[in-house]
Structures are given as structure tokens and as C-alpha cells.
Amino acid sequence: MIKQFHYDSDMAGGSLMVRESRIVAGLLMDSLTPEQWDEAIRVENVLQKRTPASAKRNATAIRKRLERLEPEFWRALRDGDDELATQVAFCGALERNLLLVEFMETVLRDAYMSRAEHLDAFVWAEFLEDRSHRDPAICDWKESTKKKMGQVVFRMLAEVGYLKSTRKLE
């Protein structure tokens, strides 16, 4: 029996969050127990978030991205300069988000090849519509979720230098 394909993405969880990713990388390097992890994230609030729920949500998203990378990347993220840390956080996001990879391989590549000076905001919606043929569950996602994911993708691309601005999508 053929298994139905589904995108497994955490892009609604936030952009690169480099500062927070550095902290999470350090926690991963410390090999904390689940109890120690919870203590650091929710009680000590090492990510400095307003609520324990926000801290847990961000930490979980970042952890899922970074756990796909080798520990050497965690060290580079934690100890490297801002540019290196941003690149490593982006690598983690790419490893975790096939949708992001495919968006870059198709939409962003086409924009570069055609020397487009900016991206239109609707390209994310069109991209998701195209991908819904591969994963029909995308049609069930809330419009607000799709929009938030697009905002996060454009913010990531700006943070890593592929776009100059998230306002004009240049």
C-alpha cells in the first residue's frame, strides 16, 4: 500500500530566531534530561519569552530544527559570529521544512533566473495551491496559518539575505 505524502512543517512556529537558537543549541549540547529541559525553558525562562507557553512553543520549533543537524553545527550556532549563526539556523529550518526547500527551488530560483526585482506577496499562496496537489491536507489548513507561514518564509529569506525587505519583498 502506498502511503499518502504529507508535508511536516513548523514554519508557523517562527522565523530563524537566531538568539533563541543559540540558547537552544547550548541546551542540546548539555544533553539535558526532559525535566532539566522543562526547567530551563519554562521555569528559568532562558529564552526570555512573555509566557511559558510561548517559550515552550519556540523552544520546541527550534529544537526540532536543530536536532536534524550534527552537534558540530550546534557548536557553530552557539559560538559563531552572527552571520554563521544565522546560516546554521537557516540550515536547520531547511532540514525541517521541505516546503521551504521546494519554495526556494521553484519560486525563488525562477525569480532569480528571470532577474525579478521583487516577489509578489501572492506567490506563497500560489505555491501552496500547487503543492496541495501533492498533499491535499494543505487545503484543510486555515487561511491564517497559510498567511503566517508565508510571512515566516519571507522573514527567514530576509534574515538570511535572499530578500532585502519583507515589506517590498525585494
Q: What does each model-identified segment do?
A:
Residues 14-17, 32-33, 95-101, 127-131:
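Helix-boundary capping/turn motifs
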Residues 120-136:
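DNA-recognition alpha helix
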Residues 108, 112, 116, 132-141:
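Long, low-complexity intrinsically disordered regions
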Residues 1-88:
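Eukaryotic partner-binding/assembly regions in large regulatory complexes
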Residues 89-91, 95-118:
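Positively charged, polyanion-binding regions of nucleic-acid-associated proteins
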Residues 106-108, 126-127, 156, 160-161:
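Catalytic DNA-binding helix-loop module of base-excision-repair DNA glycosylases/AP lyases
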Residues 139-170:
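Accessory, usually C-terminal, subdomains that scaffold auxiliary metal cofactors
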